A protein has these predicted regions:
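Basic, low-complexity intrinsically disordered segments
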Residues: 1-147
Length: 147
C-alpha cells in the first residue's frame, strides 16, 4: 500500500503562489512551475503541487497531476539549453507536449520547434508532420557547412 510520508512542501507552495501572482505568459508560468517542482527531490512533489494549485486556485485550469509532471519534464528538457528553451517558449503548451512526448532526435526536436513557431501549426498538423517524418533533418538556420 502506498502511504505518503510527511513532507513539508511549504516553501514550494509559497513559490507556486508567487509564480501565479506574477501573471506570466502561459509558457513562462509553465516553465517556472516546472522548475519549482523539479527542485524537490521527493517523488510526490508533482502530485502535491497539483493538489495545492487545484485547491488554492480553483479559477485556474490545467493543474492535474499528469500536467504538473509534464511541466516538470518541460523544465528538465530545456534547463540546460537556452536556445531550445527560447524556441519552446514561442509556441503553446499543447504543441510543446506533442514535441516532448514524440521520440525525436535533438535535431528533429529543433526543427519541429522552429517549424511550429514559424508556421503557427495546429496540433493536428504537427502530429502529421511528426508521424510522416515530414520535417527537415536540419534546423532552418543551420548552415550547410560547418567549419
Amino acid at each position: 500500500m502506498n502511504v505518503r510520508k510527511p513532507v513539508d512542501y511549504g516553501t514550494m507552495y509559497l513559490e507556486l503562489t508567487a509564480i501565479l501572482a506574477q501573471n506570466l505568459p502561459q509558457m513562462g508560468e509553465i516553465h517556472a512551475i516546472g522548475k519549482a517542482v523539479s527542485q524537490r527531490p521527493e517523488k510526490g512533489a508533482a502530485v502535491a503541487a497539483a493538489e495545492f494549485l487545484q485547491a488554492n486556485f480553483p479559477d485556474r485550469t490545467g493543474f492535474s497531476p499528469r500536467n504538473v509532471r509534464r511541466m516538470r519534464d518541460f523544465y528538465r528538457t530545456y534547463e540546460n539549453d537556452q536556445t531550445r528553451l527560447r524556441l519552446a517558449l514561442k509556441i503553446g503548451w499543447t504543441l510543446n507536449v506533442v514535441i516532448m512526448e514524440a521520440e525525436l532526435t535533438s535535431v528533429q526536436r529543433i526543427a519541429c520547434l522552429q517549424r511550429a513557431a514559424a508556421e503557427r501549426l495546429s496540433k493536428k498538423k504537427l502530429l502529421e508532420i511528426i508521424l510522416n517524418d515530414a520535417f527537415a533533418e536540419k534546423p532552418i538556420d543551420e548552415p550547410d557547412e560547418i567549419c
